[in-house]
Amino acid sequence: MCRRVFIAILFASALIFVAHAQDGPKNSFVLIIRHAEDADSGDGISPLGEKRADAYKDYFLNFTVDSKRLEPKAVFTAKDSKKSHRPRLTLEPFAKAAKLKIDTRFGNSQSAELAANLRANQQGKVILICWRHPYIPALLDALGATPKTFLPNGKWPGAVFNWVILLSFDQEGHLIPSNSRRIDEHLMPGGSQ
């Protein structure tokens, strides 16, 4: 009997901890994009992708939502792989113009580790992340967001390159659904579904 009570108390404590755990970095905004268009071959981006990457420079230097300027102060991209350097190449023009270093320590399957790093080290900032589209749902989930809220069927479509997911976090690091959304950046013709 005593053991059952102990287990019940332990379980209840775990539920309370989970209910109050923070989703993302406190007092922060996280912007998530997919890398620019793929080159026909190799690990880079296409000429259209290069135009998008260059357009992101001014777009994110002047990023405004609801009349509030949200210029990124931290930049993360998925780690380069043998097949793709696209996330890093997509944000290099912006990072150079903003004089920010790109953090490339986290690979595709390290969304939980990236989210933990953001919670621990990036509070009070606007954070820009460029990721590979099949792994964005896991990144959203790791930040306490429901992928189906932002992506059709909870997946980023393969042909879409022009969305920005904006996640807003309060002083406790909890997601603010009313201030979080998907934005169509309208930098290049086409791309949305």
Locations of the language-model features?
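N-terminal hydrophobic alpha-helix used for membrane targeting or insertion
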Residues: 9, 23-24
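Enrichment for repetitive, rod-forming helical segments
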Residues: 10-11, 59
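N-terminal export leaders
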Residues: 3-8
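Active-site-proximal alpha-helix that buttresses catalytic centers in soluble enzyme cores
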Residues: 24-124, 135-193
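Periplasmic-binding protein-like
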Residues: 126-130
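Hydrophobic h-region of N-terminal signal peptides that target proteins for export
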Residues: 11-19
